[in-house]
Structure formats: C-alpha cells, structure tokens
C-alpha cells in the first residue's frame, strides 16, 4: 500500500509539472515587425512572449516567395537573432533585449530567441 501511495504521489507531481505554463521556455515581452500586404497597406505584427530556442517563421513574410518583413523591434527580455531567409537561413543579425527599433532597411522572415536568463 505504501508503494502504491508513493507511485501515485510521484505521478501526480509529474502531471503537475507538465501542467505548468511554458513561460520558462519563452521570452517575456513583445517582438514586432512590419510588412506590406498584397493591397499595399503597411501592417504591424506583434509576437507576445515568443517561444525561445526554436526557429519561428514570421506570419505573412516567412516564405521566401513573398516580400520580407522589416523594421523589427525586440522588446523582450532576451536577445533575438533575425534572419533574412525563411527557416532561420541567410543573412542574420542580433537584436539586444529591450532594444531600440531596427531600421526599416533591415529585412526579416524568421527569428530565433535566446533562452531566458534565470
């Protein structure tokens, strides 16, 4: 009976850990960029608390067959690498955490955020 209670407690604790929010794997804050729609309108997209450590192809510009986004602004708590190509390929630049907006000449299709500092 003691073993059964120990196993049940361990499984319950494991399930609780899995249910915790994934904020430990995300940057905290906002990352924004701009792009021009097919109708010629400038739009701004915001990623709120984006995932860290994995490549993110950006909405509306993450395909090499469409015009790139531009003017990225990293207001998260981690540095980010922005890529001119999709799937985190091509020319790349680093933007600091809580940085100033980049110039509109800086094109972006995909990004990868650093892991947050503990």
Predicted regions located by residue number:
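Compact beta-sheet-dominated domain cores in extracellular/mature segments
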Residues: 2-118
């Amino acid at each position: 009976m003691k073993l059964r209670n120990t196993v049940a407690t361990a499984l319950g604790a494991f399930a609780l850990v899995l249910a915790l929010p994934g904020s430990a794997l995300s940057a905290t804050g906002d990352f924004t960029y701009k792009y021009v729609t097919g109708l010629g309108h400038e739009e701004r997209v915001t990623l709120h608390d984006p995932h860290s450590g994995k490549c993110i192809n950006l909405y509306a510009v993450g395909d090499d067959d469409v015009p790139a986004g531009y003017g990225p602004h990293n207001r998260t708590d981690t540095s980010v690498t922005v890529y001119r190509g999709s799937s985190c390929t091509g020319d790349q630049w680093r933007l600091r955490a809580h940085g100033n907006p980049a110039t509109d000449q800086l094109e972006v299709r995909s990004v990868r955020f650093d892991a947050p500092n503990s």
